[in-house]
């Protein structure tokens, strides 16, 4: 078992408190690996042998590599950059009872109780005046700043019997005392801008501290945002490491999966379709040739899966549940919440066999509907053969999640094989 890839993942997550930081860190990694950044506002020059990427909204990325000789379609993978969190409202300061709290709302379906009684801070992006223009700046308040305090057991004797949390009351973070100047001066200082120059912002709470490896043999990863930065980073590492094949390799990291993907930068947008069409046009393909390429293309939708829980095995289908450190998970759902079918499963299994990577399967217990993910959503706009996969983890949508060290290495190996193979 190699621990180095997992430690690199933890370092990436620590430096990526929001989807905007995720995208910037991916951008820097692509540039360092010789990829050329394209802009949707400009004409593209794409040539065989070239390596390129394009970002949308500062929170989604599509990277692609064109082989010298194209004799196939697109070999694509998709993961997502966002995670459940609390987003600050436009007027965030709330003053009451000699305290200043921050007014927030939930982003995505989180386990709210896991955000209590731990050091938090604020990160995201601000839009500021600069020389007559509006400029975007990333910001992260790099210190322990906030806490969401629990109510003491002495005041709520039934707390351990189950608690219903109200997002407008129970989960408001504490910033300071009655003389606090509020959050804006702190954000402005962290961004190195004047308060009056901030015209807009997208700010979120995030958990402080770096994740860790634990377990008897350090076989588990404990960290925020494993859903879905574990798959996002694993797909990207495989994409960068793969040898050239006859397919155009495409790695997508979309935003807004946790809220349904129906945004201009989500998997339900035209971002991927637009990018593939522009690639084809730059390579001299017409619409019919593009459709022929799509007909022989493939998409791996990578989003983490629920591992069998050590305390609550009753929530899983006993014959179709995955375990941590036992392989990449292929996900199935009869109602198409996952896009896997017999053919796409077979293709991905063959890829994993060639890479020496074990696979597992997951279907939800038949009376528990479970969630959906990128594959079926993306398929409506880019209809290609698709497999939904993930890595097994515990406590999905908790502020800290647990996954297997070995599985992350398995994913990198599988995606390296996938991007380098002729499907």
Predicted segments — roles?
Residues 1-423:
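N-terminal hydrophobic/helix-forming segments and targeting peptides
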């Amino acid at each position: 078992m190699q621990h180095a890839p997992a430690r690199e993942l933890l370092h990436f997550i620590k430096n990526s408190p929001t989807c905007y930081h995720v995208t910037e860190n991916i951008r820097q990694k692509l540039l360092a690996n010789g990829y050329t950044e394209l802009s949707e506002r400009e004409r593209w020059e794409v040539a065989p042998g070239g390596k390129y990427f394009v970002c949308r909204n500062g929170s989604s990325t599509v990277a692609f590599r064109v082989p010298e000789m194209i004799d196939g379609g697109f070999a694509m993978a998709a993961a997502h950059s966002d995670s459940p969190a609390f987003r600050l409202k436009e007027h965030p300061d709330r003053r009451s009872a000699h305290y200043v709290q921050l007014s927030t709302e939930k982003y995505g379906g989180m386990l709210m109780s896991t955000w209590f009684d731990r050091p938090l801070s604020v990160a995201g992006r601000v839009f500021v005046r600069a020389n007559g223009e509006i400029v975007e700046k990333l910001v992260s308040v790099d210190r322990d700043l906030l806490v969401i305090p629990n109510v003491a057991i002495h005041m709520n004797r039934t707390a351990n019997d189950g608690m219903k949390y109200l997002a407008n009351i129970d989960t408001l973070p504490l910033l300071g005392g009655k003389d606090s100047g509020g959050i804006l001066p702190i954000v402005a200082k962290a961004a190195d801008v004047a308060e009056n120059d901030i015209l807009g912002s997208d700010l979120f709470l995030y958990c402080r501290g770096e994740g860790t490896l634990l377990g008897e043999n350090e076989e588990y990863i404990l960290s925020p945002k494993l859903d879905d930065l574990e798959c996002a980073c694993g797909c990207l590492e495989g994409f960068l490491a793969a040898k050239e094949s006859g397919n155009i390799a495409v790695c997508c990291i979309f935003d807004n999966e946790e809220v349904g993907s129906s945004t201009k930068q989500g998997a339900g947008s035209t971002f991927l379709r637009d990018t593939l069409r522009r690639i084809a046009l730059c390579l001299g393909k017409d619409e019919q040739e593009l459709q022929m390429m799509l007909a022989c293309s493939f998409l791996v939708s990578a989003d983490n899966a629920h591992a069998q829980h050590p305390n609550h095995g009753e929530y899983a289908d006993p014959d179709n549940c995955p375990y941590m450190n036992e392989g990449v998970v292929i996900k199935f759902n009869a109602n198409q919440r996952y896009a896997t079918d017999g053919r796409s499963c077979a293709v991905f299994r063959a890829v994993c066999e060639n890479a020496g990577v074990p696979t597992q399967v997951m279907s939800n217990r038949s009376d528990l509907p479970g969630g959906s993910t990128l594959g079926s959503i993306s398929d409506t706009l880019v209809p290609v053969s698709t497999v939904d996969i993930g890595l097994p983890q515990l406590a999905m949508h908790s502020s800290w999640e647990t996954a297997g060290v070995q599985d992350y290495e398995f994913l990198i190996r599988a995606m390296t094989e996938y991007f380098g193979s002729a499907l």
